[in-house]
């Protein structure tokens, strides 16, 4: 399992933020939250989390991508998983992913997590990332 890894969760929807925080905490993780891309990066620099989960669309349509880009260009961020949380496929029918190296290079995220979050899928992706790093 995990040794109480810190997860930074960034979402401007306060209800979903709290719901996802409780879901992730139920699996033994410590969750620190932020409600915007700007606050998310400030918290990231301060706490140096073990992973980040970032909503795609917050104050701007590309806020999640921008925050992900900033984190992945930070020395600490290069070595941790960053997941984009999105309901874009559900809302628009437009599907995109992070399964190929080209897609991951473009969006900078290690994986996409579709809303609503299925906690088992999230934990599986997170643990798979750490297994690859061993």
Task: Go through each PLM region and give its residues.
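Short amphipathic alpha-helix used as the core "switch/output" element in two-component signaling
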Residues: 42, 65-78
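Active-site beta3 strand of CheY-like receiver
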Residues: 47-54, 58
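His-Asp phosphorelay/catalytic-motif detector in bacterial-type signaling
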Residues: 48-50, 76-81
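Alpha4 helix (beta4-alpha4-beta5 surface) of REC/receiver domains from two-component response regulators
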Residues: 62-66, 88-113, 120, 124
